[in-house]
């Protein structure tokens, strides 16, 4: 099971997330994101056994692999328009998708991604927008699902109940400012998520 906190920019926030039970830490390498970090900054942040996830948007596979080497990533989370031919060959992939009412899981049937990370719809934004989606849509999928988008301690149990996911992910709803985690909100989210997932 995955308990992920995304948009980590400091060692302090990473330590607090892991202490509260996070099993995956997300670093954003999309330059237009307010949570952007360089590969060197990410490399300097230790994660004590939690999976290291890099967020990318329409980045060249060779560049993803280069950043993964520098930052010691375990997973590439691809948020753009990437198809299987754009996946980095040497890295586990989580493919992010924005869920709309007519979302079709069949488009990912041939995807070699380890999981689909489902996010709420948000025009021109690639994650971190804080929008939820209809979690019941995820329950019908045969894919391994990570639910993201607008999650915090107040709603993660309901999301797990309706979506039956492999994991959950939160970013903007547990911040005091973009790129700066609110430790109490983050801790409350992770504790609620652990209880809901039976982790």
From Swiss-Prot:
It is an enzyme of class 5 (isomerase). GO terms for biological process: L-tryptophan biosynthetic process. Its EC number is 5.3.1.24. GO terms for molecular function: phosphoribosylanthranilate isomerase activity. Pathway: Amino-acid biosynthesis; L-tryptophan biosynthesis; L-tryptophan from chorismate: step 3/5. It holds the Pfam family PRAI. It catalyses: N-(5-phospho-beta-D-ribosyl)anthranilate = 1-(2-carboxyphenylamino)-1-deoxy-D-ribulose 5-phosphate. Keywords: Amino-acid biosynthesis, Aromatic amino acid biosynthesis, Isomerase, Tryptophan biosynthesis. Signal peptide: none annotated. Belongs to the TrpF family. This is N-(5'-phosphoribosyl)anthranilate isomerase. It comes from Solibacter usitatus (strain Ellin6076).
């Amino acid at each position: 099971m995955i308990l992920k906190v995304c948009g980590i920019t400091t060692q302090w926030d990473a330590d607090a997330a892991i202490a509260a039970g996070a099993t995956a830490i997300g670093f954003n390498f999309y330059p237009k994101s307010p949570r952007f970090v360089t590969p060197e900054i990410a490399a300097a942040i230790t994660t004590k056994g939690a999976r290291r996830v890099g967020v990318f948007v329409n980045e060249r596979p060779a560049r993803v692999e280069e950043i993964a080497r520098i930052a010691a990533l375990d997973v590439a989370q691809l948020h753009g328009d990437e198809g299987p031919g754009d996946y980095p060959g040497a890295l586990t992939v989580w493919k992010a998708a924005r869920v709309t009412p007519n979302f079709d899981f069949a488009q990912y049937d041939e995807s070699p991604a380890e999981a689909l990370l489902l996010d709420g719809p948000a025009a021109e934004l690639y994650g971190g927008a804080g929008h939820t989606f209809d979690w019941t849509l995820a329950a019908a999928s045969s894919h391994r699902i990570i639910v993201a988008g607008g999650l915090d301690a107040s709603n993660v149990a309901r999301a797990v109940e309706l979506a039956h996911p492999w994991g959950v992910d939160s970013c903007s709803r547990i911040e005091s400012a973009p790129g700066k985690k609110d430790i109490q909100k983050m801790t409350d989210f992770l504790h609620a998520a652990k209880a809901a997932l039976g982790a």
